[in-house]
Amino acid sequence: MVQLEQRIEDLEMKLAFQDDTIESLNQQVIRLNDLLADQQEKLRLLTSKLSQVEPSNIASQAEETPPPHY
């Protein structure tokens, strides 16, 4: 009977540790979800700003005529 009580106590202790671990992991998932939402919003804003950028009137270096050599 004592052995059965010890086994039950061990199981209760494991359950308590598992509950603590699950709560800790849940908090981490919540933080990561908030971070992901923030990053998605920043990406959306950057994409919007990038689509509004006008093309430059300056020719690329490959299109420029080389300077005269003396």
Curated annotation (Swiss-Prot):
Gene3D superfamilies, sorted: 1.20.5.300
High-level lineage: Bacteria, Pseudomonadati, Pseudomonadota, Gammaproteobacteria, Alteromonadales
Pfam family, one: SlyX
HAMAP family according to UniProt: SlyX
Protein name: Protein SlyX homolog
Family that this chain belongs to: Belongs to the SlyX family.
InterPro entries found in the cross-reference section: SlyX (IPR007236)
